[in-house]
Amino acid sequence: MWRPSENKVYLPPTPVSKVVSTDEYVTRTSIYYHASSSRLLAVGHPYFKVQKTNNKQSIPKVSGYQYRVFRVQLPDPNKFGLPDPSLYNPETQRLVWACTGVEVGRGQPLGLGLSGHPLLNKLDDTENAPKYVGAGADNRENVSMDYKQTQLCILGCTPPIGEHWAKGNLCTPNTLAAGDCPPLELVNSYIQDGDMVDIGFGAMDFKTLQTSKSEVPLDVATSICKYPDYLKMAAEAYGDSLFFYLRREQMFVRHMLNRAGTMGEPVPNDLYIKKSSGNLDSSIYAATPSGSMVTSEYQIFNKPYWLQRAQGQNNGICWGNQVFLTVVDTTRSTNLTLCATASTQDSFNNSDFREYIRHVEEYDLQFIFQLCTITLTADVMAYIHGMNPTILEDWNFGITPPATSSLEDTYRFVQSQAIACQKNNAPAKEKEDPYSKFNFWTVDLKERFSSDLDQFPLGRKFLLQAGLRARPRLRPVKRAAPSSSKGTARKRAKTKR
């Protein structure tokens, strides 16, 4: 007897729109431009920002362990003076920039900057403990350390995405009592200029997860350390936040210690044999990180990088006429200690001098941009509208409202006080910047484009690797041959005789 199959039938998933590469609808031209910033400098306090008496920021926090996120603004190529007006048809095409080369210049010497805490929660040296010492009421000590070593460069046309662990919420009706361990939640957010990098203590919100303010050094005790979410950016559908990235990290443990305090989760009794007297010491172990030696042999900066193929679907197209360049360089984190005389005495006294500390940074950004065209067919416009509608709005494309058949009123004496005001009182809505609430280092390159690539260091490197030659400027002029005079010809004739 025939019986139907009892196996489940799996239907194919519903088809979805396919994300295509920008190479399928963007046509690249042979026109390149060089753009560079001026020397970018930053000076501030490496541990915290110094406030004035009126609660205004006097000295900003500038640390070698902060992210530098540059928002580079580019000119609109559709309003750009082109060498060849017949390059594109403005009625059916639009121009966009493609980033093909970048070099991040870093000034200042190599060096390591220390950080620390005058009251760090350090109970014992658990690596070489001389004796079993119990915890007192306050065992905090003055400890300094160097951090994990990081070099990072991320390029995209949207801000980079970071991740960190923060305090989460329990499901109802569960409640969190005082002193209970808070639940953890992985949070994604934009990496902004000035955010702290992972220094070796984890990517987390130290302000809410370490309420003692003595577990980590001063510069991160009330801050959030973020780590780039490479997995999320690599899986992004359109690939706008991550064209490519360069990364180098290294760290080792310098000192081992344990934390003072009441153990919230004591060691189970079946894991050890009890002592004859006394209680167990703290079992919360931690370590101070170190990035070890810095050397010029392992530098990712002050070198050109050429973008041939991006890791995502966006192959370097700068949507919105902007790029976001994220930089981290802890190999130049030296802190400058300054000393000022408060009062002059004949003998040396520590109180006669005031000590200060500063950190300085120096950058130079250079780019090579390629001019590209997009033919605005119906399919391309529909695809771009689904990807980012603001792109078409910037190109002055909008939906035409349908013609209305209703009867409208038109007054003759518009300025008369006998009728109501006929003006539209609602002000025109300005275009809202989607990143206005975030903090970035804005670099305006709208007036710094040049087609003379051979006049700039990165431009000459680009011409060399691309096998191109610069346009000759000085051509040798050939002198015309001197015309023979009649007198000279007669002299030659007499000589022959």
Swiss-Prot record:
A single GO BP: virion attachment to host cell
Keyword Heme: no
Domain of life: Viruses
Gene Ontology CC annotation, any one: T=7 icosahedral viral capsid
Subcellular location as annotated: Virion; Host nucleus
Keywords: Capsid protein, Disulfide bond, Host nucleus, Host-virus interaction, Late protein, T=7 icosahedral capsid protein, Viral attachment to host cell, Viral penetration into host cytoplasm, Virion, Virus endocytosis by host, Virus entry into host cell
Region entry Disordered, spans: 473-497
Ranges of Basic residues composition bias in the record: 488-497
One Gene Ontology molecular-function label: structural molecule activity
Classification via Pfam families: Late_protein_L1
UniProt similarity note: Belongs to the papillomaviridae L1 protein family.
Subunit organization: Self-assembles into homopentamers. The capsid has an icosahedral symmetry and consists of 72 capsomers, with each capsomer being a pentamer of L1. Interacts with the minor capsid protein L2; this interaction is necessary for viral genome encapsidation. Interacts with protein E2; this interaction enhances E2-dependent replication and transcription activation.
Protein function: Forms an icosahedral capsid with a T=7 symmetry and a 50 nm diameter. The capsid is composed of 72 pentamers linked to each other by disulfide bonds and associated with L2 proteins. Binds to heparan sulfate proteoglycans on cell surface of basal layer keratinocytes to provide initial virion attachment. This binding mediates a conformational change in the virus capsid that facilitates efficient infection. The virion enters the host cell via endocytosis. During virus trafficking, L1 protein dissociates from the viral DNA and the genomic DNA is released to the host nucleus.
Entry-linked HAMAP family: PPV_L1
Protein name: Major capsid protein L1
Organism: Human papillomavirus type 54
Lineage: Viruses, Monodnaviria, Shotokuvirae, Cossaviricota, Papovaviricetes
